[in-house]
UniProtKB/Swiss-Prot annotation:
Keywords: Nucleus, Ribosome biogenesis, rRNA processing. The keyword Nucleus applies. Residues 187-227, 238-278 have a biased composition (Basic residues). Residues 25-71 form the G-patch domain. Its main location: nucleus. The lineage of its organism: Eukaryota, Fungi, Dikarya, Ascomycota, Saccharomycotina. This is Protein PXR1. Involved in rRNA-processing at A0, A1 and A2 sites and negatively regulates telomerase. Residues 289-312 have a biased composition (Polar residues). One of its GO terms (biological process) is rRNA processing. SMART domains: G_patch. InterPro entries: G_patch_dom, H1/H5, PINX1.
């Protein structure tokens, strides 16, 4: 293929010819063969002159079939193609090139070779002889010599031959009948032996099969029982686990519920306490605010022009009452209101 072909990477080992193994004399095989009388360079087996060198392997890198290169090497360069119609074409080309005789000679040789060595159908004809010169009964040539003695001799010979032939045929028939009887007897015995053997084998096979089936049934039964036991134990374990899980869940739910109830009770209690505290506080604020209102009205009536110093209230709500008083004083004072609303006189 050249450069256009696929690249084939070849990797060879450190010892592709395996020379390390063949040169190593310390191995068991080498020592054993040397004890038996073998020496390096000799063949192994009956014939000592066998192959003593290593086999060389040719790596196949193309897609051609086995033996393609050998066929190409042995092919004659001047061999003509075997396509249909090429012979006539070659003759025409030879005539045009002025080599008609040479081409015709090659073509004729090729045709003769095909006829002689080609795989063609051959018809065999049975040879016959002249009926007038051959005696079929005697299987010999007929002699036409004249004479009475010869005729008598011939007749006697013919009669003797016929008698012998009859006797031979009778003997053959007797032998054949005896042989047939013997063969029939042997065949019968063989048949009986064969039938007995087959019956015995069938019986043994049947017994083996029954034993095997019994064994398989027993094993299946044992497996089934084991499986059922295992399933029962698994079911029991699963049920116990489920019951434990349910109990645990119920317990956890109960604990959660109790915790929730406690928490709700606590929250309710805290809310109630807060509400009570708030109510008490609001009540005290109202009382203090009422007292502050009364005092402020008194101070305004007594002296409207100057600011009156409030008397301190000896109570825990004195700070709030003071703030309320200041707020009320600013609201009641006209000058302060003008400053708040930015009204000029």
């Amino acid at each position: 293929m050249g450069l256009a072909g696929t690249k084939v990477k070849q990797r060879f080992g450190l010892d592709p010819r395996n020379t390390n193994w063949s040169n190593n004399n310390n191995q068991f095989g080498h020592q054993y063969l040397t004890k038996m009388g073998w020496t390096p360079g000799k063949g192994i087996g009956l014939v000592p002159d066998s192959i003593t060198t290593h086999l060389k392997i040719n790596i196949k890198t193309d897609n051609a079939g086995l033996g393609a290169k050998l066929q190409k090497r042995n092919k004659d360069a001047n061999e003509l193609d075997e396509c249909s119609g090429v012979d006539a074409f070659q003759r025409i080309l030879g005539r045009l090139n002025g080599k008609e005789d040479a081409v015709n000679k090659v073509m004729d040789m090729k045709r003769d070779d095909m006829i002689i060595n080609g795989k063609m159908g051959i018809r065999f004809v049975k040879g016959e002889v002249l009926s007038s010169t051959w005696d079929k009964e005697k299987k010999a040539l007929i002699s036409y010599a004249n004479g009475k003695n010869e005729d008598k001799k011939d007749k006697d010979e013919v009669s003797l031959l016929r008698k012998r032939k009859v006797e031979d045929e009778e003997k053959r028939e007797v032998k054949k009948s005896r042989k047939d009887i013997k063969e029939k007897k042997e065949k019968k015995e063989k048949k009986e032996k064969k039938e007995k053997k087959e019956k015995k084998e069938k019986k043994e096979k049947k017994e083996k099969k029954e034993k095997k089936e019994k064994k398989e049934k027993k094993e299946k039964k044992e497996k089934k029982e084991k499986k059922e036991k295992k399933e029962k134990s698994d079911k029991k374990e699963k049920k116990e686990k489920k019951d434990k899980k349910e109990k645990k869940e119920k317990k956890e739910k109960k604990e959660k519920k109790e915790k929730k109830e406690k928490k709700e009770k606590k929250e309710k209690k805290e809310k109630k306490e807060k509400k009570e505290k708030k109510e008490k506080k609001d009540k005290l604020d109202k009382e203090s605010s009422n007292a502050a209102n009364v005092e402020s009205t008194k101070s305004l009536v007594s002296d409207s022009s100057r600011e009156s110093t409030p008397t301190p209230i000896a109570s825990r709500l004195s700070v709030r009452s003071k703030w309320i008083k200041q707020k009320r004083a600013s609201v009641m004072d006209a000058k302060a209101l003008n400053e708040i609303f930015m009204i000029s006189n």
